[in-house]
Amino acid sequence: MILEARDISFSYERKGAELFSNIKFKVENNERVWVPGPSGYGKTTLCKILAGYLEPCKGQILLDGKPLPKKGYCPVQMIWQHPERAVNPRLKMENILSDGGQVENRIIEGLGIEEDWLNRYPQELSGGELQRFCIARALGK
């Protein structure tokens, strides 16, 4: 898969100052990317656009040459820094995990997710245990 940003620009107010403009890049399959910068410079906003949470003011995001889906599952996933804010506290972990579609057993085992954790609620897990579920969910489908 190739994730491509084509000339994307963004501002929080449609006619306000741009947070960033005309960004272009491609991320190839199995390539890792690092986005450094101080707080407030748009790193998280850029990631939200790449994952389809926000729309750019200009430009487009493509996955294998096609726009990201507007509805349903998006194959571009974001793993949030604070896992407790990324899950529904009313759902058991088994349901939260299935939000990402089918997660392979090798991923669950590789992350060290224990079977009895599946029947717990998020607040019954440590931050590290909860983050493992968020990573597994992002790797699903």
Summary of predicted features, one role per range:
Residues H82, P89-E104:
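Q-loop/switch helix immediately C-terminal to the Walker
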Residues G59-G72, V103:
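Conserved ABC transporter NBD signature motif
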Residues V103-D116:
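Conserved ABC ATPase "signature" region
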Residues K66-Q77, R85, L91:
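ABC ATPase NBD coupling module
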Residues A51:
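Helix-to-loop junction immediately C-terminal to a conserved catalytic motif
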Residues N95, Y121-L125, E129:
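Conserved ABC ATPase signature
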Residues I2-A5, S9-N22, E114:
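A short, flexible loop at the N-terminus of ABC-type nucleotide-binding domains that lies
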Residues P36-P38:
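The feature captures the beta-strand-to-loop junction immediately N-terminal to the Walker
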